[in-house]
Amino acid sequence: GVCNNTSSIKVARSALHYFEEPSISGSNGSGTIFFSGCNLKCCYCQNKEISTNNFGINISIKRLSELMLDLQSKKANNINLVTPTHFVPSIIEAIKLARRNGLNIPIVYNTSGYESVDTIKLLDGYVDIYLTDFKYFDNKLGEDLSKVKNYFEVASTALDEMYKQVSKNKFSNNGLMTKGIIVRCLVLPTKGNDTKKIINYLYQKYQDNIYLSIMNQYTPVTTNNSFLFLNSKVSEEEYDDIINYALDLGVKNAYIQEGDTSDESFIPPFDLEGL
C-alpha cells in the first residue's frame, strides 16, 4: 500500500531517545520504537531511510510487546511509537499483551497527523499522549510536499478525536507528561505564514488545553530541485517572528527550540538497535 508495508509489523530501532520535548524525554529518555514505512511521502523527510526506503525487520506482536517491556526495564519514561499508523491493530494487541505482563508507563502515539478518525477511535484507552504533527494549513503545500490531499481537514478532524480522548493534560511530580496532547508545528523555510495560520487555528480552537511545539529543526538532507526553498534552513529571523506571533496571540503552553537544532546529529541512526 501507500505505506510500503503489509500488515506485518516492521521496525527499524527500539531505544531510549533524548531529543523529544522535555516532558516526553525527561532525563531518562523516551522509549522510542521506530516503525518502517509511512502514509506520507514528504520530499524533505529526515527519516527517509525507514519511511521511504522501508529499512527494518519484521517482528511478531509478541516481540513488539517484549520491546516495550525491555524499554520500561531501561527506565524509559514512556513508550513512544513513531510512525505507527499503518500497524495500529497489531500495536493495540501488543499493548494489551505488554500490560498483562507489567507495562505501566504511558503510551505516546507519535504521528504525522494524517490519520482517519476511525483509526484514532481504535486507540481510545490505549494511548495516553498524542504527539502529533500539524504540518500544513494550505492543502496545496500538503499535495506538493507530502503527496496527500486535504491535509488540513484530515489532520484537524483527527485532532478533534484525540482531544476527546485525552483533553486533560496531566504531569508527574517531576514534570513528565502522563496524559495529554502535544501538537508539533515544523517551520519550513519561507513558509512562516502557513505556520502562523496553524498556530492561530489551534489556539482559537483549543486555547492552552493542548501544548504546541514550534520547531526550527528543519534540516535539508538532500538537494531538492523541485522546491528550491527547501534547500535552506529556517532563519533565526523567521523563527523569532513566529514565536512573537504566538506570544502576541496569548499562547502560554508551548515548547520552543533555541539555538541550532537543524543538524543531522539529531537524527537517530537506524541500525536495528534494540531489536
List the predicted regions and their residue ranges:
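Conserved Radical SAM active-site core
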Residues: 3-129, 138-139
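Conserved radical SAM core fold
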Residues: 51, 88, 113-116, 134-152, ...
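A general structural detector for well-ordered alpha-helical segments in enzyme core domains, enriched
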Residues: 64-67, 91-95, 119, 123, ...
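Conserved glycine-rich "GG(E/T)P / GGGxP" loop and the immediately following alpha-helix
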Residues: 72-97, 144, 150, 160, ...
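Non-cysteine beta-strand/loop elements that form the S-adenosyl-L-methionine
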Residues: 124-139, 209-218
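Anionic-ligand binding region
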Residues: 143-174
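Auxiliary Fe-S-binding modules of radical SAM enzymes
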Residues: 167-275
